[in-house]
Amino acid sequence: MINKPNANSHFSFLNSATDEILPSIWPLLEQGLWKQADPAAFEENTVVGVLKRGDWKPVIKEFIPFYREMRWDEASKSAYDPTYIPKIAKTDWGSVIDAASNFFNKYQSKRIAVQLSGGLDSSIIIGLLTYLKIPFWLVGMNTNRYEFRTERHIQELLFPLAEGAILLDFDTHLPLSQLLEVPTHQHPELLSINYSSENAMALTCEQLGIEVLLTGDGADNLFAEALPDDPNLCPWIPQVFSDPWPAEYVYAPRGVELVPFFADEGFMDAIYNLRRGQSEDNSKWWARKYFERILPLELVQYDYCADFWGLYISGMQAAIPTIKSLFDQAYRLTGNFLFSPKSTEALFSQDLLEAKKEMYQKIEARTAFAVWLHGLKKKGITS
């Protein structure tokens, strides 16, 4: 591999033809590289999924995003995501508390908040902070929709534990809203279509002086995945713990560091040693029982799963005029059939109330690609 990745960014770019790492492709985009971007390849990558991002095809000519956590295999001349290999050690409750304390100590001079969802994962973080008597704020999304009644109840139980709590109305920051305001970015990104809610939380953090926002990303893997006896076979890969796009393009510009608590190696080691050899536990009963001393009783005795479908389809239906406008613009810029009036009509003439994954993958991928082009146009690159 030629050159090192950009240490100051979550992203660099790998030239798959030369094995060269570029810290940025902005100069090339300004020279017209964007014209060689392939929306079909981006759509295929969406189907492959982020868990196998090492298998993604180049979307912009031969350039592939090379994420900070990725490694380079010289033998195969390819990028890959390394699995985490936990350290074996005797572990008990004290070990868990020590790991959490060591993590929080890294931010002891900063004002921290937890991204409050009303679910188990963020509640564990809140419970640990409370147990350690560390002050914190709560920032999150809330909705009066019936399907989120349990999350609302848990949020209300946790409010008094924090220095202060701000909950924003999810129905005013639906998925696929504010697409025209998405920050300009170098490469198409699926997470850009969820910009609105992330931006609302980032803005709130900035207004409150919050410097670090802790998320529960990755807890599903720690607490629900089957864990082998052999730590070398541990399945944990970097991208299940963090979303680099909102961290870099939404939170960082507002002076907020988005930090996934469960990606801390000390805490990962502790949970691996406690769950080592356990089978899949999708309801996370082990975690509910193990952390019962710091959790609301409801989270210990019951399991539930948030249903975001209603929010999603509301956002989709409201955004259709904007999406069609973005597709029209993308078609004028690229001439690509995927954005043609005929293709757009075929895409949106389907029954959108059917939760068909393959249908929504196409809509989301094309929307994210069109949003990327719109950002380049705002920056004056495509004109």
Residue ranges of predicted features:
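Adenosyl-5′-phosphate
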Residues: 33, 61-64, 209-210, 214-217, ...
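Catalytic metal-binding/acid-base residues of hydrolase active sites
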Residues: 121, 218-220
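Hydrophobic (often cysteine-bearing) scaffold residues that line and stabilize catalytic clefts
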Residues: 92-100, 150-151, 193-197, 283, ...
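Cysteine-centered catalytic environments shared across enzyme families
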Residues: 1-174, 211
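Short, hydrophobic/amphipathic alpha-helical patches that form generic packing surfaces
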Residues: 24-30, 44-55, 196-203, 245, ...
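ATP-dependent adenylate-handling ligase core
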Residues: 142-203, 220-236, 271-279
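Amphipathic alpha-helical segments that form well-ordered structural scaffolds
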Residues: 46, 99-103, 128, 157-158, ...
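Short acidic-aromatic active-site loops that bind/stabilize oxyanions
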Residues: 89-97, 187-191, 257
